[in-house]
C-alpha cells in the first residue's frame, strides 16, 4: 500500500520540481546576452559592409522582438579580446556605475541605428562600420562583459 502511494506522488513531485527548475534553465545569463547582442567575430568580412547587414543581424539576434531597438553595436573582434577589456582601463559607466572598462586599442565595430522610416514590425537600420575603442561593463568572477556602454574615438 505504501509503495502505491509513493508511485502516485512521485510523478507529482517531479512535475513540481520541474516547474521550479525550468524557468532557471531558460533564463539567459547577462554574459550570454552580451554575446548575442554585441559579438560578431566573423563579421569583419564583406558581409558587415553590406547595407543590409544591420537589418539581417538585428532580426537574426532577436533584437527586434516587440519593438525596433533604436541603436545597437556589433563588435568584430575575437571574444577573448573583448573579454580582456574587463582588465584594462577602468572608467565610469554612463549610468554612474564604476564597473566599466575602456579597451586599450581600437576595435572594428558596426553601429546599427534605426532609420527615420523604421516602424515595428518593419524595423530598418542604417549600417555604419567604424574602428573605435569600446567601453563595456563587466561583472562576475572571472570578470566578463555584460553590457556594451559605448565607444570612443581614438585620441591620436
Curated annotation (Swiss-Prot):
Catalytic residues of the enzyme: 38 (proton acceptor), 147 (proton donor)
One Pfam family it belongs to: RnaseA
Disulfide bonds: 54-112, 68-123, 86-138, 93-100
Residues carrying a glycan: 90
Binding residues for substrate: 33, 36, 69-73, 94, 113
Its job: Endonuclease that catalyzes the cleavage of RNA on the 3' side of pyrimidine nucleotides. Acts on single-stranded and double-stranded RNA.
Protein name, as recorded: Ribonuclease pancreatic
Amino acid at each position: 500500500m505504501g509503495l502505491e502511494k509513493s508511485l502516485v506522488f512521485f510523478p507529482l513531485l517531479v512535475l513540481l520540481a520541474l516547474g521550479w527548475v525550468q524557468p532557471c534553465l531558460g533564463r539567459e545569463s547577462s554574459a550570454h546576452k552580451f554575446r548575442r547582442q554585441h559579438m560578431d567575430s566573423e563579421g569583419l568580412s564583406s558581409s558587415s559592409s553590406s547595407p543590409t547587414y544591420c537589418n539581417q543581424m538585428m532580426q537574426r539576434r532577436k533584437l527586434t522582438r516587440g519593438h525596433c531597438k533604436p541603436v545597437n553595436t556589433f563588435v568584430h573582434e575575437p571574444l577573448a579580446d573583448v573579454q580582456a577589456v574587463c582588465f584594462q582601463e577602468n572608467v565610469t559607466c554612463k549610468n554612474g556605475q564604476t564597473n566599466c572598462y575602456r579597451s586599450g586599442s581600437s576595435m572594428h565595430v558596426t553601429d546599427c541605428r534605426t532609420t527615420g522610416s523604421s516602424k515595428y514590425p518593419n524595423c530598418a537600420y542604417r549600417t555604419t562600420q567604424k574602428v573605435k575603442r569600446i567601453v563595456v561593463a563587466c561583472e562576475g568572477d572571472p570578470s566578463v562583459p555584460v553590457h556594451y556602454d559605448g565607444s570612443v574615438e581614438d585620441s591620436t
